[in-house]
Amino acid sequence: MIQKNAILDVADNSGARKVLCIGFLGGKKRALVGDVIVVSARVVAPRGKVNKGRVYKAVVVRTKGPIRRLDGSTIRFSSNAVVLVNDQGDPLGTRVFGPVRKLPVGEFTKVMSLAVEVL
């Protein structure tokens, strides 16, 4: 579960390393895996596509909080991570690092296809 002012890792090669959650789309108070959030780039790599302080949209792909599956099992990750996306939902980077939780059907298929492992 992601709340406002949370510092998140970036799981793609867009150039951002850490981002700050500054808002949610859809009038929500918190975000889970698959939700789109508004972030501000805080730590960026030199010569990346992302500029420090700029505002971007991102989709949550990993959370530290446990996620309950339909079969009763739970899954949790070691970090909260996002992938930066544009207005159409396509990722800004060309690679996605680490495992990605299965995202809602029909949404962010490009992000899931770039992921190394989909859980």
Swiss-Prot record:
Please cite one Gene Ontology biological process associated with this protein.
translation
Which InterPro entries does the entry mention?
Ribosomal_uL14, Ribosomal_uL14_bac-type, Ribosomal_uL14_CS, Ribosomal_uL14_sf
- What is any one of the record's Gene Ontology cellular component terms? cytosolic large ribosomal subunit
UniProt entry keywords in alphabetical sequence: Ribonucleoprotein, Ribosomal protein, RNA-binding, rRNA-binding
Q: What Pfam family is a match, any one?
A: Ribosomal_L14
Q: Which GO terms describe its molecular function?
A: large ribosomal subunit rRNA binding; structural constituent of ribosome
Q: What does this protein do?
A: Binds to 23S rRNA. Forms part of two intersubunit bridges in the 70S ribosome.
User: What does the sequence similarity comment in the record state about its family?
Assistant: Belongs to the universal ribosomal protein uL14 family.
Subunit structure of this chain's protein: Part of the 50S ribosomal subunit. Forms a cluster with proteins L3 and L19. In the 70S ribosome, L14 and L19 interact and together make contacts with the 16S rRNA in bridges B5 and B8.
Q: Which PANTHER family match?
A: 50S/60S RIBOSOMAL PROTEIN L14/L23, LARGE RIBOSOMAL SUBUNIT PROTEIN UL14M
* HAMAP family xref list: Ribosomal_uL14
Entry's NCBIfam families?
A: rplN_bact
Protein name, as recorded: Large ribosomal subunit protein uL14
